[in-house]
A protein has these predicted regions:
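Acidic/His metal-coordination segments adjacent to aromatic residues that form catalytic metal sites
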Residues: 26-63, 111-115, 129-148
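Internal, conserved structured core segments that host functional sites
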Residues: 38-103
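Inter-helical turn/loop segments and adjacent helix faces that build the functional surface
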Residues: 14-15, 74-92, 106-121, 139-150
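Extended, helix-rich structural scaffolds rather than catalytic motifs
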Residues: 120-184
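Conserved alpha-helical segments that form or flank metal/cofactor-binding pockets of metalloenzymes
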Residues: 1-30, 107
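C-terminal intrinsically disordered extensions
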Residues: 81-91, 98, 110, 167-184
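Alpha-helical scaffold segments in carbohydrate-active enzymes
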Residues: 2-10, 92-110, 125-135
Length: 184
């Protein structure tokens, strides 16, 4: 929430006028909300038919790891933004997201290389969630404009490093990376 607040405050300052952090966060039309689908999925493993499930810590860990690996790279790249305020937010956010990455990676390894059950559940969660990461690399017009202005990052330039982080953790966790392909 702290990272989002800093970004909303920056945008409100840049827009000026009656625009406030709260207006940006809470008073937008539905189509103005943006988020990766991965982050909106329930915190349980894959289901089929009318099955129901309780929350699954492994699913939460897999999701946090995949997203934190991206955000660590993104904040690191944004430290070089031409917008000094955004660069400062990135520097502060990078410290926090590195902690999240370390925490989720450690737990991913514990669960993946743990008991047969924790391994199987972690692999099932990875198989279920991984295809949604393809959305990370879908280029948007807003991203292109930010890159052109020198304030943003082309996320596709981060993919090789993200792949390396993910592959190293999965190898240590004895988990298999799902086949390429996704839902984008």
């Amino acid at each position: 929430i702290g990272q989002a607040r800093m970004l909303y405050q920056l945008v409100a300052t840049l827009k000026g006028g009656a625009v406030t952090e709260d207006k940006l966060a809470y008073f937008r039309d539905t189509h103005e909300f943006r988020n990766y689908t991965l982050l909106e999925l329930p915190h349980h493993g894959p289901l089929s038919g009318y099955a129901s499930s309780s929350l699954d810590y492994g699913t939460t860990i897999v999701r946090n790891f995949l997203y934190s690996a991206l955000m660590a790279l993104l904040w690191e790249a944004l430290e070089k933004s031409a917008n000094a305020d955004l660069a400062a937010i990135a520097a502060k956010s990078l410290k926090e997201v590195r902690y999240h990455l370390r925490h989720s990676r450690d737990w991913l390894v514990r669960l993946g290389d743990g008991t047969d059950e924790s391994h199987a559940r972690s692999q099932a969660s990875l198989d279920h969630l991984f295809p949604y990461t393809q959305e990370f690399w879908a280029h948007s017009p807003a991203e292109a404009a930010a890159v052109e202005a020198g304030i943003g990052v082309d996320l596709n330039t981060l993919k090789a490093d993200w792949d390396a982080i993910v592959d190293a953790a999965l190898a240590e966790a004895t988990l298999q990376r799902p086949a390429a392909g996704g839902y984008v």
